[in-house]
Amino acid sequence: MNLVRLNPALTNDELRAKLFDGEFILLSPTKPLQALVAHARGMISGAFSDQDPCSVQHRIPVEEFIQRAGPLKSRFTNDPKTKELIRDILVESGCDLNSTYFDVPRLRVVSSDGYLVSGVGYAYKAHRDTWYSSPRAQLNWWLPVFDLIPSQTMSMYPGYWNNPIGNSSADFDYDEWIRVGRTNATKQGSVDTRKHPLPVEKVDSATEMRFVLKAAETLLFSASHLHATAPNSSGQTRFSIDFRTISLDDLKSGAGAPDPDNASQGTTLRDFIRASDFQPLPEDAVAMGARRT
């Protein structure tokens, strides 16, 4: 059963176990989460020089939007303050900083009504993160920078929890993605030509769920959940933040969520850094985790 829990009184070990069972965790805005959102808003305002960045797509050509959004996303990811703010969030959430690792945080920019659906504004089709070579032990943290409405959020498909769906993950290799796919994001025009892993059969939307969150409200879910960018018909660009965490203890024990239909190659584990000092995951842990993805 895919339960939704709001601000649960759980230890971090208990929280991870619930997420590995397919549950969703919602966190109310806290000072560290609000600080991360404020940091992102400052960068967004600087990039677009606009009092209302959510509607800027209506005032500039898409080529200019790409030229502004691409560097913005890179600055957010690589800014040392971004990583420090993520660490503050993990401290408040009860994570052990010596055994918790997180990957580079990302600022997502999802425009409205087909203005930009590729490259830096890619609207993700239904997928599991494990299809992109993520480990079963990965947990996803997702929060909007501005308040959302139903036509501006994510779609979750909990009916596929532990149930396979035909997909093209066997054609995905993470090393190739790093070499070609990610670096070519700003070169994508109206059609995204990168090799994304996708369903090869129709997704049953009978159990679709959408979380309509306020700014800094945060959704936690397993990397094994099937999810997608909901079609944005709001007239407003959606800005959101996501990052992923793993516990070294889970990699060692083999703990994680079901992974019923993943055939991707490679591993994202080398992207993760330790929360305490931002050092990379040791190679022996990468090898151990990769064998279990």
Residue ranges and their predicted role:
Residues P32-L33, G114, D147-L148, W161-N162, ...:
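Short, solvent-exposed loop/turn segments at secondary-structure junctions
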Residues S151-F221:
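Double-stranded beta-helix
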Residues M1-G94, A285-R292:
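N-terminal auxiliary "cap/dimerization" subdomain that precedes the catalytic jelly-roll/cupin core
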Residues C54, W161-R179, D261-L281:
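Short, cationic low-complexity segments
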Residues D88-N162:
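Conserved double-stranded beta-helix
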